[in-house]
Amino acid sequence: GYRLFQHAYAMEEAHLIEALKHIPAREIPSPKNHAEAMRSQYQEFWNDAVASEIANLKAYGVYKLERLPPGARPINCRYVFKVKANQQGLVDRLKARLVVQGFRQRYGIDYLKTHASVCKLSTFRVQMAFCAQHDLLHDIIDVKSAYLEADMKLPVYINIPGKTPPKGMGFRLIKSLYGTKQAGHNWHQTIVPKLINEWGFQ
């Protein structure tokens, strides 16, 4: 799985190093959708970005092909395309992220809880004051692809642009893909027990 992602990313990088990395990032428009990306003069590079994203999702086991149950309504997804620039303002890479159109989800069928606790500003200020008073370091961690570590609790099926499943089949979400209403809640439910039980937080 992860090797497939690494291979796709290496292919993308090879194309970019050769052809795009001397171009200012602002000169390459970000497509609004998959169809526009495939019509773009940079179509092959956006195609590589899509392949890299799909390989990453497969590496995380985000979805799998299943027979659609009666009454199931797959939710549309879209790609969000972005040109990433380096410190010189030149093209670093072309990125595609698959996002669920969560506004199409139905409460009680596709999702239940959506809340996720976050740190209050007052709590953060107390932490900063405590660290300053005791000459401590304060670290902030960003978990890469965090939502993709969290399991989906309800069966949700999606449509992926450019991928047509066999008749009667659909792509079921196994992990909390970006855009789903419950993604933040699922990640919170995943990380808190680990922080307390495995890493010693109270």
Regions found by a protein language model. Give the residues of each.
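Chromodomain-type histone methyl-lysine reader module
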Residues: 1-193, 197-202
